[in-house]
Amino acid sequence: MEIVHVPVMVKEVLSYFSNLRGVFLDCTVGAGGHSEAILENIKGSVVIGIDVDEEILSVAKQRLKKYESEGRAKLLKATYVEAQRVLSQLGVKAVNGIIMDLGVSTLQLMKGERGFAFSSDGPLDMRMDKTQRLTAYDIVNFWQENQLRRIFFEYGEEKRYAGRIARFIVKNRPVETTAKLVEVIARALPEKERRFRRRHFATRVFQAIRIAVNNELENLRNFLVQVPDILNQNGRIIVISFHSLEDRIVKEAFRSIQELDVLTRKPVRPSLEEVRENPKARSAKMRIAERK
């Protein structure tokens, strides 16, 4: 598979990691962009990269094979909630840097059969981990209307039309493909909502379903409480998020965990130049904390 994924805010990541050495944990290695930058620019660095998506992990393995052969990179299939177990298995007690990029990879979005994108037709899947049972199809076709309304409201921040969209989905079952789901959402929304929203009108619903399928918010909370146990003193954690729900969780966790010093009162945003070159970076927010 051709590598087209461009990692976001690489310069900022390297800047905040510049004084660190030793072992780094890439919790969402994806296509390997941030890991590659760390290995290339931080002398003597070693990266442990984990990702729950085997397909994209194979891309990272290809990209980082030189470093794997040198013993400077170790890539494993795991979710970041399992980070402590993974490090223990590798004989690593703690690391000096942690990077998390919570965005969906371009490679995942490009493959219609993964079901993440509303821009290309495919089955309703949306699983990061293809071995798990719950899919987007299950949620769309079998969850009760009030359950759908709740996730659209809470996870998609679809404040005004969550109930109406849920009602239309239930009424039009079975909904088997991403294209059919987009069609149903379109019918549920007034024309002005479809035409004048800043982002595509299906964005919020797709986000909500993806978060529910992969238990993303709960996993993030469960990981962040582990950070003091796996980060060395003066080590740093960088989290890049792409919507307000994730950013709020990171902000509150960094503030509430006593062992962390927050280095960013407000989130760091990508430069205008980066956004021009890589529009995916537009909504990125980076927060950094340091282990006391």
From Swiss-Prot:
Record's subcellular location: Cytoplasm
Pfam families reported for this sequence: Methyltransf_5
Disulfide bonds: none
InterPro entries: RsmH, SAM-dep_MeTrfase_MraW_recog, SAM-dependent_MTases_sf
GO BP terms in the entry: rRNA base methylation
Annotated catalysed reactions: cytidine(1402) in 16S rRNA + S-adenosyl-L-methionine = N(4)-methylcytidine(1402) in 16S rRNA + S-adenosyl-L-homocysteine + H(+)
UniProt KW keywords: Cytoplasm, Methyltransferase, rRNA processing, S-adenosyl-L-methionine, Transferase
The protein's Enzyme Commission number: 2.1.1.199
UniProt main location, coarse: cytoplasm
Residues reported in the UniProt entry to bind S-adenosyl-L-methionine: 32-34, 51, 87, 101, 108
GO cellular component, one term: cytoplasm
Any GO MF annotation of the entry: rRNA (cytosine-N4-)-methyltransferase activity
Stored HAMAP family: 16SrRNA_methyltr_H
PANTHER family in alphabetical order: 12S RRNA N4-METHYLCYTIDINE METHYLTRANSFERASE, S-ADENOSYL-METHYLTRANSFERASE MRAW
UniProt-listed NCBIfam families: 16S rRNA (cytosine(1402)-N(4))-methyltransferase RsmH
Function: Specifically methylates the N4 position of cytidine in position 1402 (C1402) of 16S rRNA.
Family (UniProt): Belongs to the methyltransferase superfamily. RsmH family.
Record's protein name: Ribosomal RNA small subunit methyltransferase H
Source lineage: Bacteria, Thermotogati, Thermotogota, Thermotogae, Thermotogales
